[in-house]
Amino acid sequence: MNKGNTLDSIPTDLILEIFSRLSAKSVGRLRCLSKLWRKGEWFFFSSLQPQNLYEKPFLVVAADFHMKFSEDMSHDIYSYASGLIYFPKMLIENEKSGAIRVICNPITGQYAILPKLITLQAARSFLGFDPIDNQFKVLLVNNDIVNNDMDILTLGIGELMSEKLKFIEAKCFFALDDVQLINYKGKLGGISWNNHEVAPVELSMWVLEDVEKQEWSKNVYILPKNVVPNNWLHAAGVTVEGDIVFSEAVVSNPFDVFYFNPEKNTLQHVETHCNHEVFDDENLVNIFVDHVEDLKFDVMKPTYAATSIRPTEQKHKPTSTETSMSRKDHQVRTIDQPQQDRCTFESINNKFDVMCLLDDD
């Protein structure tokens, strides 16, 4: 088996053997990425997500350490999508081109290097997964106020074609300082909450009910102050059951995670314990939910890298596609990028192909 690049010393075949012997329930976990302030290092942990959240008023789980990321990474924003983590600036041994954009599988340690772009080198970028076309995409947004062009990198295999993108107006967010977009049961949503020490946590949630008419619904919830500490909270996302997950923005031992279900108006407190030095200090932390449940292994195979909804019958070659567009006219141009460093991403997907057997249990 082609291992591809790896950040980890554990052999790929051994990891595949371990995962193939586990049930899907055993693998479904809450992921945690913690940054050690004093050294600039990143640590990756996971803990089992409780299957029956609301049977008990209080739950305790354990977190397991998986791997450590390079301390030479930039402090720039990273992002997470369907089991992969994207770092916009990472220094890798034997790479002479300086900081590069990398997509990494934090469980196996494998990574894929994205092609360099001449334009938008200073742009902010984010990783996402398109479940319709089964593609991973990286969005690059220019920081320049005058030139607000955007680039989209699509990972996969296929022919180059074009697509039309449509923007959704969200005027309900304009007056807010901070809104986090979420996937709420298949609908686009946004949440905002106050981080004040005096008042209880007030959570506002908007859901796009009609895409064509661009109609949003809004609900406001008050989280009980005696359960949720009113210090700085981080929203991890939404589980497949519709629970909004919050955690403390700074790690502690024990580490508190909160599940709030808007439909049932229920709140669950989960206490996470870990025997690791990272949890002993006040380090930054971000968590991700439904690591396996959101990871559709069967659709993470290399797919058509172009933006075509209907794949052609021709023989396909591996590509990495750059799609550039402007907010003003929504026009799209597509540029074929060189085939460098593509085999590493295929090896990541090969590992997912084997792990998809877990869904059959």
UniProtKB/Swiss-Prot annotation:
Disulfide pattern: none
Domain F-box: 4-50
SUPFAM superfamilies to which the protein is assigned, alphabetical: F-box domain
Region (Disordered): 308-339
Pfam families given in the database record: F-box, FBA_3
NCBIfam families hit by this protein: F_box_assoc_1
Protein name: Putative F-box protein At1g33010
Organism: Arabidopsis thaliana (Mouse-ear cress)
